[in-house]
Amino acid sequence: MTRCKHDVPEAPAPSADPDAWWEPISAEAPAGPWLEYDTAYAALGARMVPPVEVQYGDFRQRRDAPAWPELERECRDLLRRSRDITLLVWWLRCRVHACGADGLEQGLRVMQRVLRALGAHVHP
């Protein structure tokens, strides 16, 4: 995987490396389980929402911007368990925030390889 100047060094866990994501998780379930109702998946999805300003009368509050390196680690953790197009898009967004155009290129390349290798097995 291409690293960029904003990447935080970490020891990759098994299958946390995007270069392994196009390999089946198991013979019985190549894409692993669908995590749609998994609490970690739902929490990650809620944190991927861009910050918005909320105003009620004189009260104003702006939610903090997402912590992209932390969100990327969470995407990788979930992608170890499941091949899900939504997770891949979230991971791609994290890579764009970390590396700009290089992150976009890397993310699209990984998504293409996953979809070619696992096709219809990838969860929506």
Predicted features and spans:
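N-terminal domain-start signal
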Residues: 1-124
